[in-house]
Curated annotation (Swiss-Prot):
Coiled coil: none annotated. GO terms for biological process: histidyl-tRNA aminoacylation; L-histidine biosynthetic process. Keywords: Aminoacyl-tRNA synthetase, ATP-binding, Cytoplasm, Ligase, Nucleotide-binding, Protein biosynthesis. It is found in: Cytoplasm. Its EC number is 6.1.1.21. PANTHER family: HISTIDINE--TRNA LIGASE, MITOCHONDRIAL-RELATED, HISTIDYL-TRNA SYNTHETASE. It comes from Sulfurisphaera tokodaii (strain DSM 16993 / JCM 10545 / NBRC 100140 / 7) (Sulfolobus tokodaii). GO terms for cellular component: cytoplasm. GO terms for molecular function: ATP binding; histidine-tRNA ligase activity. This is Histidine--tRNA ligase.
């Protein structure tokens, strides 16, 4: 017998839960369109090597990977950025820079399912390709902030930021290979600090990395101390610009009234980040609800010209989880049920329904075969605001009988007055 449950790690959505998801998506779409971003859609199925090239074979265990009927190894996309870069290289290189793109769709990861983590989930994100200056960092952060302001969450969230370039440049000084660097950062991301540090040779730079990773809330005192050490103790003046850049971003976020902090031990799980990285946190959940960063080398890694880029992805379902109570996010819906009491009135009733829908009212014709005494409470329970009764008399007189399910008031009015009457009472 077929199971009625969705496949493990997948989830059905309906009602209020789905409504909140749509609220998040609509807020995202509103802001990114106003910011001048263009929509792009890419396939769910991609060549596995698109993701493995930078992430390595260890990605295989967390992805849906399979061979198609032609024997090609393909995967369900675990994220969007590699697909966007592939599309850019295939179709958009000729356009003037920077290029602003947005996407919205499902991604797939073979993780262990738990609260807030499913194997299929939605991501809404943007990518800005062709700019490396700090203004592009600010543009991305500003758009992210505006989306959460639109969702009335700006005073609840906290933005965690870092510049991964600091750690990468020190690892380069230690002559750590790219593959070992990714493994090191992967361990840091999983909280396995000691195991990660054990991979490094004994060196003063290893000591520096240890010290930097321990700074989880950079203040002016620790900022000045690290700058002094980079200059006088380690002779790494070229790293100061990376430290200054993240500190400048933090100061700007402060001036914008955004709750943010710099965690120098923060790294993100994706292997391609090269500069600014960030995550959005909310106190009601233990996981991030959005994140992103700069990936200046990914286009070149895929065989294209050196092209700086930055972007973010919002976890749509995760953000929906932390929305306020339904009445603060739910659009006012005035659902109207139309009850046809006479067969000869059906065409008249259809015309009424069409008029209501054309004026943005939710209207349905009754299909329930139950008595009027049971019909009225059933519609009230389903969230309807009004019922319209249309019988032989209403059809002949071109009137409708309207019942307000909140006040219990019932009136009979002319058809041509219906819309004006509804505007007065809603």
């Amino acid at each position: 017998m077929i199971s009625y449950e969705p496949v493990r790690g997948m989830k059905d959505y309906y009602g209020e839960e789905l409504h909140k998801i749509k609220v998040v998506e609509n807020a995202f779409l509103k802001i990114v369109k106003l910011a001048g971003y263009q929509e792009v859609e890419t396939p769910i199925v991609e060549d596995f090597q698109l993701f493995a090239l930078k992430g390595g074979e260890e990605l295989r265990n967390t992805m849906y990977v399979f061979k198609d009927k032609a024997g090609r190894e393909v995967a369900l996309r675990p994220e969007f950025t590699p697909s966007i870069v592939r599309f850019y290289l295939n179709s958009l290189q000729h356009l003037p820079k920077p290029i602003r793109l947005y996407y919205l769709g499902t991604v797939y990861r073979y993780d262990e399912p738990q609260f807030g983590r499913y194997r299929e989930f939605r991501q809404a994100g943007i990518e800005l390709l062709g700019s490396s200056n700090i203004y592009s960092d600010l543009e991305i952060l500003q758009i992210l902030i505006e989306i959460y302001r639109e969702l009335n969450l700006i005073n609840k969230i906290r933005l965690k930021i870092n510049n991964i370039s600091l750690i990468r440049k020190i690892l380069n000084k230690l002559n750590i290979s790219d593959n070992l660097q990714e493994h090191f950062l992967h361990l840091i991301d999983k909280g396995k600090i000691d195991e990660a540090l054990s991979l490094l040779p004994s060196s003063e730079y290893t000591e520096l990395i240890t010290n930097i990773l321990s700074v989880n809330n950079l203040d002016i005192s620790s900022y000045n101390k690290i700058k002094e050490d980079l200059t006088e103790k380690y002779n790494l003046k070229d790293l100061i610009q990376d430290l200054d850049r993240i500190m400048l971003l933090k100061n700007i976020l402060d001036n914008l009234g955004v709750n943010s902090y710099i965690d120098l031990g923060f790294v993100r799980g994706l292997a391609y980040y090269t500069g600014l990285i960030f995550e959005v946190l909310h106190p009601s959940v233990s996981f991030s609800i959005a994140g992103g960063g700069r990936y200046d080398n990914l286009v070149e890694l895929y065989g294209g010209p050196q092209t700086p880029a930055i972007g973010f992805a919002i976890g749509v379902e995760r953000t929906a989880l932390v929305l306020e109570e339904p009445n603060t996010v739910k659009e006012k819906q005035n659902k109207i049920g139309v009850i046809v009491l006479s067969d000869e009135a059906i065409l008249y009733a259809i015309r009424i329904v069409d008029k209501l829908r054309s004026n943005n009212y939710i209207a349905t014709i009754n299909l329930k075969s139950i008595s009027i005494s049971k019909l009225i409470p059933s519609y009230a329970e389903e969230g309807y605001s009004f019922l319209i009764f249309i019988g032989k008399k209403e059809y002949e007189d071109k009137t409708i009988t309207l019942k307000n399910l909140s006040t219990k008031e019932q009136v009979t009015i002319k058809e041509e007055n219906l819309l004006d009457y509804l505007k007065q009472i809603i």
